[in-house]
A protein has these predicted regions:
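Structural preference for solvent-exposed beta-strand-turn elements
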Residues: 1-396
Length: 396
């Protein structure tokens, strides 16, 4: 095999694949990537850990068809260090690969292509959503997925499209993140109900982050397929049933306090410094016009801060794991900012265009029933997405 490719193109595609390549594995070939020719003007790059596979197609000048299989990490490190010029690859005898870029020359040890696993093909009729919407779903739910390997049915996200609505739900048993959006046009006829593993979600977010097009997806009995602008991610499906999350969605939280997201986030960060390291407990006392936060450690002391809030009702103390609060506030802040990121363009009249970012304060609605029932948080006045975060309180 022999081909030439732009350094920037190769660096980008190798960067996407690094997340799924195994660095420490009992199957040595999984530390490698496969590069194959596709006609005269394109190559295909594949990396896998057998659970998640990423396949990228890239423009290249193919002088001789064939394939090479070399260390994913070593190749990526070399390509990142090269100048922004064309990179030339040539396969030699005994699987060795010579690569040149400018005055730099390298020889890499390769392995036989036959050792590399076969990749499932994407045969099902694909459904599609805007990649920005899918990425939005992932960014604001993935943090609530459990890290406990034994709870495999919770180690991913439930993704549903039905009745003209797209929905994603995650939980670790202590908290739950829920987001949905109404679909329009041809999207309304789509239908899917599946579990997407956590690793696949995180890799999808990287691929979809700066993409302006659609993401096509489908499934077979064992795999999920996601395709975005020439890049295909394949994931093994999770077996088992996701819990009935609707049972924990609060139906009668008739008390609500509304506060500024940034003010609360800063207060939680400060007060949590005095929380007990074992329980991570922080206490919120909701009263007329304010929410008081306090945390204490028997060995180190205590911290207290008051955040203004729109609230009229009974004084109610509620305990939380401060990390659960902060993760929601961090993600809701990113979510709100990206929603508002459609900045207005203003002309000065002489052809000069300046961009004005009109970000306003983001408000959070904190909805509860009493000290013991689950609390629901959401972005107030958000009409585009229905985003809810439900947390079980701690005993205080």
């Amino acid at each position: 095999m022999e081909f030439t490719i732009k350094q920037s193109t190769l660096k980008d595609e190798l960067g996407f694949i690094q997340g799924v390549v195994e660095r420490k594995t009992t199957i040595p070939v999984l530390a490698n990537i496969l590069i194959e020719s596709l006609g005269d003007n394109e190559i295909r790059i594949v990396g896998t850990d057998l659970d998640v596979t990423i396949r990228c197609d890239a423009e290249a000048v193919v002088e001789k068809a064939g394939s090479i299989c070399v260390s994913a990490r070593k190749l990526f490190d070399i390509v990142r260090a090269l100048d922004a010029e064309d990179v030339h690859f040539k396969k030699d005898d005994n699987e060795w690969v010579t690569m040149k870029c400018g005055r730099a020359k390298f020889r890499l040890a390769g392995v036989n292509r036959e050792q590399f696993p076969e990749i499932p093909s994407f045969k099902s009729t694909p459904l599609s959503l805007p990649a920005a919407t899918f990425n939005y779903f992932i960014q604001n739910t993935a943090f609530a997925i459990t890290n406990e390997v034994s709870r495999f049915t919770l180690s991913g996200a439930k993704f549903v499209i039905a009745d003209g609505i797209a929905r994603m739900v995650t939980t670790d048993g202590h908290r739950l993140a829920f987001i949905e959006q109404k679909l329009s046009g041809d999207e309304k006829t789509s239908a899917i109900d599946t579990l997407i593993p956590r690793k696949a979600l995180l890799e999808l977010a990287k691929i979809a982050r700066d993409t302006g097009g659609d993401i096509a997806f489908g499934e077979d009995q064992k795999h999920l397929f996601f395709e975005i602008e020439g890049r295909l991610l394949i994931s093994r499906t999770l077996t088992g049933s996701f819990p009935n999350y609707e049972l924990v969605m609060p139906k009668d939280n008739d008390l609500a306090a509304v506060f500024d997201l940034e003010e609360m986030r800063a207060a939680v960060r400060r007060v949590s410094l005095m929380a007990d390291d074992r329980t991570r407990s922080i206490r919120l006392i909701v009263r007329d016009g304010e929410i008081e936060l306090n945390a204490q450690s028997s060995e180190e002391g205590e911290g207290r801060e008051v955040v203004p809030a729109e609230y009229t009702g009974p004084e109610t103390p509620i305990g939380f794991n401060w990390q659960y609060l902060l993760e929601f506030l961090n993600n809701a802040g990113s979510m709100a900012n990206s929603t508002k990121a459609e900045a207005e363009k203003e002309s000065d009249g002489d052809g000069t265009v300046r961009v004005r970012d009109g970000n306003a304060a983001t408000r959070i609605s904190f909805e509860f029933k009493d000290s013991n029932a689950q609390t629901q948080m959401r972005i107030a006045d958000n009409s585009e997405y229905d985003y809810k975060y439900i947390v079980m309180p701690l005993r205080i």
